[in-house]
């Protein structure tokens, strides 16, 4: 059954303060990462690091997500606007975050933290990888609620009519008028793939289940990080075929998107890590010892 998107992106208004669902999804993602990370620390999945050390790591990773995500968006998707007005970088309330930029931010944070605590960088990355997918899933749900990053037209019964995705002059009509037209079936031809939910399922739920299961037992170094990079790259590349290209423009061949181009290095990197893991040592869980100074 085709759905008419009429969800208010603002979850709560407190006078001049507006709490957006997208922000709540970020909070849920960070909360999930904190809870899951503490469980993995208690199970000895990052030897020598206790709960305090993990909280320190997560703090820097969160900074990497936000700063890297915003900077990445401006560089990858809005470079012209950024060069014209660099202050746009700080207008986070206008939206605009890049997963690939956020990933680079997390990598930088984990590299710095690992070096500070004299831990193998990829042990840290393997530890963090299973904590990320649920946050990705929540973020894509936030995209859906905010009616952004929608897909291409579909005649499937699961399509969604996004008012902001309607062509002119329909996108100028008031909400009540659009609902009345939708009730007659007049807008069904403009139903789109809910690509945000596809990504929430694949990059969120499926990746979490796989990575959590693999990381819950002894495994070779590089394996979990390699699976993360490979799976995200493949899932993102695939969903981009039914998702509208950024700014409505293809990069090449009238089908290749910027998101697909940015995903290709991830796929290659994931494959390299999986090959490296075959000769890497097997990591065994070790319960944290606060006295070791990794706090």
Curated annotation (Swiss-Prot):
Give the transmembrane ranges. 17-37, 57-77, 92-112, 127-147, 196-216, 222-242, 255-275
Q: What is its main location?
A: membrane
- Compartments where located: Cell inner membrane
| Recorded GO CC terms | plasma membrane
Cite a single GO BP annotation. lipoprotein biosynthetic process
Give the enzyme class: transferase
One Pfam family in the UniProt entry: LGT
Residues annotated to bind a 1,2-diacyl-sn-glycero-3-phospho-(1'-sn-glycerol): 140
Keyword annotations for this protein, in alphabetical order, are: Cell inner membrane, Cell membrane, Membrane, Transferase, Transmembrane, Transmembrane helix
The record's annotation in NCBIfam families points to: lgt
What's the name of the protein? Answer: Phosphatidylglycerol--prolipoprotein diacylglyceryl transferase
- Biological source species: Stenotrophomonas maltophilia (strain R551-3)
Q: What is the lineage of its organism?
A: Bacteria, Pseudomonadati, Pseudomonadota, Gammaproteobacteria, Lysobacterales
